[in-house]
Amino acid sequence: MNFTGFQASGKSTIAKAIYYFRTIKDDIIELAKSQALDATPVYGVKSTLSIEHGITLRKALENYLREKFLRTFGSSWGMPNDMYMEYHFTKTCYVKISLENDSRYSTPNYIWITMSNELIRFLKANNHTLSVTPLGISEEDLRIFKKNLYEIFEDSCSVVYIPAGRSMITLLSQQLSYIYATMDDMQKRSLDTCTKDYLERILRLKPEFSEGLQGLAYSSGRSGLSPRLVVQALDLTQKILRGTYRYSNGEEQIVLEDGKYVKINFSSSGQQECVWILNLLFYYLVQQKEILFIIEEPESHLFPESQKYITELIALVNN
């Protein structure tokens, strides 16, 4: 699916809305894990989402979706009162976000969450169902929980959101880990959800590229992925980047054909803009994971020929 149009015509809003809804299943999993660890804390095991003590899974999800809405779309105060978003995962599973203006609520345009009966039944039936072992959440309980949840949503895809304005994040690559590590929880929450997810993903995956894309390609031989497909993806990546990416000694580099390299923060604007699109596409191709990619402005700062190549790479990975 492609969106084109004038600036401020709503393309990013639609992309963020898809991300918001398609990651709800992941939110439910993390909230269920947090609920279990809140009831039975385990030393050294930290939950990724904070949760109110003793709260039900349904209420925890409603609270989190309100917070997630604000961090994804901004304050609801300036939005029209009749604004709503509704996403149908199946004929019987949906989530609707709307605004309520009522004296019962302390703020104007209160964010109201409506869920389908099937989803509500699942949340009630699976309230406090994950058990905790001395090592953390029971793997078997979590496996069954995910299986049942994915059946409700008819969706097991992970979502990878690649926002616009990537070059600034790439430009600060050397300082990025330090900047993010020194931010407190409040500052991290001030980042919009999509950007935060993107930042954390690239910080987590950088070490995987210590041997460059060729190192990842080598591991693909053990996964049963077609060598022809890998070579084709590597060739397109080389044509777009005019080099290959490598993460070495805490430094991001573009390695040129003659073996010399350029630090990523001194590379061209086009390379900075596209490098992590290419890295993420190739990484998940090799991992053979079912991924929904949401990519904003993949053609940004690229020559028309390179725009053609990146379109071909996206199609190759998608198919």
Regions found by a protein language model. Name each.
Residues 41-52, 217-232, 309-313, 317:
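Short flexible/disordered coil segments
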